[in-house]
Structures are given as structure tokens and as C-alpha cells.
Design a protein with these regions (language model features):
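ATP-binding N-terminal substructure of ATP-dependent carboxylate-amine bond-forming enzymes
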Residues: 1-102, 306-309, 315-316, 321-322, ...
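Short, well-ordered beta-strand elements within core beta-sheets of diverse protein domains
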Residues: 155, 288, 376-384
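ATP-dependent carboxylate/phosphate-activation module, predominantly the ATP-grasp catalytic core
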Residues: 183-190, 194-253, 257, 264, ...
Length: 424
């Protein structure tokens, strides 16, 4: 184990999901710096030092790093920081989890899809703008930007007229003006998978079923709970994982995360969205508690040493969580003013609750956007195999409450556990 005491680590973006990175680094004796353009970012409040430099201002960050003798740089799970992170590391000659090629493939949906096809990994059937105009498509369609943050710019289209509008909308939300038009996979199970590469070998560390909100709440594109491990874990290991691992190896990645989202379709996964980062949320805290493997501490160590073998804990089969079940709950609310929030601290005291984050504070007005702007809190549950899962869910929902100005509950699209759909 390395002695990293006193080393300086720069973390790109101070969102609350980076709090765990700051905390872990400080526990390791590392001097932490967080930068973004927001003065009150949550992770900045925990860090030893905060910079008011936008994560996309590579020139300014590089110069500041030189002045302050920064020893390592990280972007743990923020989409817009992926390519700036690579550029900063490259110019400072600091350890980086990827190359220009890997970030090109894993940050652009179009490039990624082509790469999957080349390597025998299944993808969603796709259409061009010309197909739409000529009527050579099967509705409904799912249209999205080639690259964007969160779920912005996405549309489900049931007609040519809607598709034309959806394409225009996606183009405006994409940083490169591109879009992807695919078969809408509404009735297929959405999954999130994360691999962590150590010394060139990809290990599956996260594999979960993503459950969406209700259409009547306009949240049917927003994840309200991820259940881990997925009910399709056995199928994945038997039919899919080897192809995905070989594709990741072909990129030449030696260390770090690869995040892939897809849909279960019979005995395969049809992938649609990549990233060279860890997923958002705080699943990593649950993973470390359940298995001892730490994605956070592993990446921190790599950022400061460049050691591709320096995993903290054993990643083999850790996604199974030693037989437990994890639920990553996102609490969503209807539009309106959040007059009162109750029970947050009481939820954190529950034995099966590993973490909690209040994302949007009391008093804020929630818009009717149907996207991440309606996510107000997140909780992570780790449930032993002999414990009733729905009872644990109910304990959270009955305790954590968001009230409007009339004292009425604002929480909508609560996740309901329906048991495992596939035999393990």
C-alpha cells in the first residue's frame, strides 16, 4: 500500500456524488482540491481547497495545477468532465484512465454503437433521418442527442411529425449537433453495467435493473430505482459478458471504469449508452461495504501513482454483493414548491440504509420537466438475503416526506418491488 499522505488531488466538479471521493481521499491523508464554476458545490464544502475554475477551462486548470504542484487529477462520475479530464492529464503528464481513442468511443453514442457492431456486441436497431422522412421506420421511436447530460434532449415519438420535432430537439441538446434514432425499447428491462479494469482485465462491479417512473407522472424516462444485482445476472454471465470484456480489452484500457447501459432482450443485452467513468450515485459506498472492493480508493491510488495493479480490495464477482440486494432509490416529486422536508435524518438511522443525499433543498420550486430536475433525494439500501425487501422500501417511503404548501405529499413514482423475474 502506498503512503499518499500530503499528495495533492484535484477533483473535477463538486457535485454531491463526488463527496465520497473527497471523504475517501482525506481519510487517506491526501490534500483535496475541487474545482467548478459554482461557489457552493457540495464537495467543495468538504475539500481542503476550492477553485472557481470551470471544468471545461482546460488551459486555466492546467496552469493552476502547475502553480500548486498538483500530483493527480480525477473525474469520478461526471459526464461533461470526461474529455477535459483527459486533456488535463495529458498536458500535465499525469496518470489517466484513458486515451483520446477510448474517450472518443465511450463518450459518443454514435461512435460507440459502431464499435459495438464491429466487436459482436448487440445494439438497438437504428434509423437515419432519411428513414424517418421516407417512412421506413417502425414506431414508436426513441430519439436522443449523440452526447448530452442526463436525459436532456430525449423524445419518444409515435409519428413522423413527432419524429421530425424530436430530431430537431435532440440536435439542439447535443454538443456536436448529432442525434441517434432507435427502436423504442419501452417494454424491455433497462440495465446499467459497470466494469472496473485492473491491469488490463475488466471486472464486472455493477449490474443492475433500472426501473423507471410512471408515464402518468411524466417520469417514464427517469430512473426511480436500480436493483442490484440484476435478475438477468446468470444470463449475462452465460451469454454476453465475454463479448463485452473482449470489446473493452480491444480499447487497450489498463485501469479504471467503463460504464455501459443497455436493454435485456432474450439472451442478450442491447447496449445504447457508454461512458468512461463510474455511474452517478453512491453505489460505490454500498459495494465497498458489501465486498471490501473500493472503486473510489482504487482510482484515487491510480491517479496519484499510475499503478494499474493498485486495486483496493478484490473486484472478482463483487457485483453479486455477497448475496445481498442493493436498491438505489431516487425520490421524485411532482411540480410545485417543496415547503417542508421531513424524516431525512431518521431514514439515515435505519440499519439497511447505507447512504442518503438531499439533492434539492427545502423551499425550492420543482418544474414540470420530467427529467433530473424532479429528483430531490437519493438513498442507498443494502438488504440481507433473508430480509423482506418491500418492508425496507416502505420504511423509507413512510419516513421521508416532501410536503407542498398545503401539507400534501409531493412524492410520486414510488418504486414497488415485484420479486425476481428470472430464476437465479
Amino acid at each position: 500500500m502506498y503512503n499518499l499522505k500530503g499528495k495533492k488531488l484535484l477533483i473535477l466538479a463538486g457535485a454531491g456524488v463526488h463527496n465520497k471521493v473527497v471523504r475517501a481521499a482525506k481519510e487517506m491523508g491526501i490534500y483535496t482540491i475541487v474545482t467548478d464554476y459554482l461557489p457552493d458545490s457540495p464537495a467543495k464544502k468538504l475539500a481542503d481547497e476550492a477553485w472557481m475554475l470551470n471544468i471545461t477551462d482546460v488551459d486555466a486548470i492546467v496552469e493552476k495545477c502547475k502553480e500548486e504542484h498538483v500530483d493527480g487529477v480525477m473525474n469520478f462520475c461526471i459526464d461533461p468532465a470526461q474529455k477535459p479530464y483527459y486533456e488535463i492529464c495529458k498536458r500535465l503528464n499525469l496518470p489517466c484512465i484513458g486515451t483520446k481513442e477510448t474517450f472518443d468511443v465511450l463518450t459518443d453514442k454514435r461512435t460507440f454503437k459502431d464499435y459495438c457492431v464491429q466487436h459482436g456486441v448487440d445494439v438497438i436497431p437504428e434509423y437515419t433521418e432519411e428513414d424517418v422522412m421516407k417512412g421506413n421506420v417502425e414506431y414508436p421511436l426513441f430519439i436522443k442527442p449523440t452526447n448530452s447530460r442526463g436525459s436532456r434532449g430525449q423524445s419518444v415519438c409515435y409519428s413522423k411529425e413527432e419524429a421530425i420535432k424530436g430530431i430537431a430537439f435532440a440536435k439542439t441538446e447535443s454538443s456536436d449537433g448529432g442525434f441517434v434514432c432507435e427502436k423504442y425499447m419501452e417494454k424491455y428491462q433497462d440495465i446499467g453495467s459497470a466494469f472496473f479494469v485492473v491491469d488490463g482485465e475488466p471486472y464486472l462491479v455493477k449490474f443492475g435493473d433500472r426501473h423507471l417512473g410512471k408515464p402518468e407522472d411524466n417520469l417514464n424516462k427517469q430512473v426511480v430505482c436500480t436493483k442490484l444485482p440484476s435478475d438477468s445476472s446468470d444470463m449475462f454471465e452465460a451469454c454476453v459478458i465475454d463479448r463485452v470484456k473482449e470489446m473493452i480489452k480491444s480499447l487497450g484500457i489498463k485501469f479504471g471504469p467503463v460504464f455501459l447501459q443497455g436493454f435485456v432482450d432474450g439472451n442478450t443485452i442491447r447496449y445504447y449508452d457508454p461512458a468512461q467513468r463510474m455511474p452517478g450515485g453512491d453505489y460505490d459506498v454500498i459495494l465497498e461495504k458489501a465486498t471490501g472492493f473500493s472503486t473510489v480508493r482504487s482510482w484515487i491510488t491510480f491517479a496519484l501513482t499510475g499503478d494499474v495493479k493498485g486495486a483496493v480490495g478484490n473486484p472478482k464477482q463483487c457485483y453479486r454483493l455477497n448475496g445481498g440486494t442493493a436498491l438505489l432509490l431516487t425520490v421524485t416529486v411532482r411540480p410545485g414548491k417543496m415547503e417542508k422536508i421531513l424524516g431525512f435524518d431518521d431514514v439515515l438511522k435505519m440499519s439497511h440504509v447505507i447512504y442518503g443525499r438531499q439533492i434539492i433543498p427545502e423551499g425550492e420550486i420543482i418544474p414540470a420537466t420530467g427529467d433530473i430536475a424532479q429528483r430531490v433525494a437519493a438513498f442507498g439500501l443494502l438488504i440481507d438475503r433473508d430480509v423482506d425487501i418491500q418492508e425496507c422500501l416502505d420504511s423509507v417511503y413512510n419516513t421521508y416526506r416532501v410536503l407542498d404548501e398545503n401539507g400534501n405529499s409531493m412524492v410520486i413514482s414510488k418504486y414497488k418491488y415485484e420479486g425476481e423475474k428470472n430464476e437465479k
